[in-house]
């Protein structure tokens, strides 16, 4: 079959979505160096900022985990977990695995928007070797885990809670990024900017990596 015949709508479709993000990550996050690595954090945090702007979120907690993972927890309404009519799966799965899923949600209920590049949390998922999303909503905790953007099981209940909000824990894929070393000061600068721009929103940043502390357990400043 000729190359011309191979270039069809089907072949283009095959490169859309999560697969295309992994093949061309720089198109979505700028680059696969330090800037792109830190941009992943901004994308997740920006969803919490949207909730704050809508008057539903007052706290965002960002943690750098051992192994250069990132945890972002907010006290917003929580990503919807009900079945999405068009997709036939939980809305949480749609948000986490469909590029541009924000347009699939009613503007009055929930939207997902991105940061600088407007790509959203699904791109973070695609570029992570592991990601876990937990939603605290209406007294229950709903979870789903992913590997390189692919869901490992359907959204399920995992317990009860007296909190509300969304927690995302992700570990960037070492096959994608040149370095996995998050710089505390880069993230701190961005979080300070967001806090200044969003009055009434409390943003915290914690570095749990042992390499970031001195012998007495105090935070070391970046060089």
PLM feature segments, named:
Residues 1-45, 93-96:
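Bergerat-fold GHKL ATPase/HATPase_c domain
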Residues 2-10, 68-91, 102-223:
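GHKL-type ATPase core
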Residues 20-23, 27, 50, 54, ...:
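Conserved helix-loop functional segments at active or binding sites
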Residues 33-37, 64, 116:
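Secondary-structure capping and boundary motifs in well-ordered enzyme cores
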Residues 48-49, 53, 65-67, 72-75:
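Long, structured ligand/cofactor-binding scaffold of large enzymes
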């Amino acid at each position: 079959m000729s190359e011309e015949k191979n270039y069809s709508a089907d072949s283009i479709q095959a490169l859309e979505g999560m697969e295309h993000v992994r093949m061309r990550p720089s198109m979505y996050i700028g680059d696969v160096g330090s800037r792109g690595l830190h941009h992943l954090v901004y994308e997740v945090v920006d969803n919490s900022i949207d909730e704050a702007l809508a008057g539903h979120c007052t706290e965002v907690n960002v943690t750098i985990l051992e192994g250069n993972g990132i945890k972002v927890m907010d006290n917003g309404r929580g990503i919807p977990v009900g079945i999405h009519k068009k997709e036939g799966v939980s809305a949480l799965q749609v948000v986490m695995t469909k590029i541009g899923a924000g347009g699939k949600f009613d503007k009055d209920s929930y939207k997902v928007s991105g940061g600088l590049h407007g790509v959203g949390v699904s791109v973070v998922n695609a570029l992570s070797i592991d990601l876990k999303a937990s939603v605290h909503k209406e007294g229950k905790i709903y979870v789903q885990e992913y590997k390189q953007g692919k869901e490992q099981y359907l959204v399920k209940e995992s317990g009860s809670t007296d909190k509300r909000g969304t927690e995302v824990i992700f570990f960037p894929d070492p096959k994608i990024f040149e370095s996995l070393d998050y710089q505390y000061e880069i993230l701190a600068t961005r979080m300070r900017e967001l806090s200044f721009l969003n009055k009434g929103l409390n943003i915290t940043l914690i570095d749990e990596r042992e390499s970031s502390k001195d012998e007495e357990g105090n935070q070391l400043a970046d060089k």
